[in-house]
């Protein structure tokens, strides 16, 4: 196969026009097989999954903190509200509004060119930006799940002598988790696709690997199609796993 590629490449250098099949083979070989370029794509996939996982974990942690603050504030009686919690609630609301109301690309550029301008680890900066952005959306997912639990459950826990945090972690959250987890699965899929944005700031994920190949071959079609196909396969795989997980949750609810 390599010998055939070299022979066809020599014909191109000599000005000879290739037929469709030969041209297809040369471009495909250049994009994926020449100098083992497929390894760059594999490395890019690994980085993409790592960035997505880091962003999701960070998003869940930040989202849970924000959701707990907002739910805790909302559940206080109007004339007996903690002023400190009120400040945290206001900060949380403003943060969520700003993050959800501004483009992800702008947030990435601010993180890389302003906040972490001296950092050269663009991949981790991108993961951090994605995680903070995800936290705003995850907070609404978790808050919605917690608020969907019957308020009487909190009152019942408090009447048994449990404090707020114990009631929340032992009674409320276990009930809310069933509605929260499927939505978090969808957030993971969204993060997986959004991870391609970090290539703009130099994050070395899948699209970055494809751009490296394009810069050498001056042929964008196969690298970009390869990236699109890889993302499609990953999304379909995780969507199938998520659907299976949701079916199991539904079955357990019926028992």
Predicted feature residues:
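Transmembrane alpha-helices and adjacent helix-loop boundaries
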Residues: 1-255
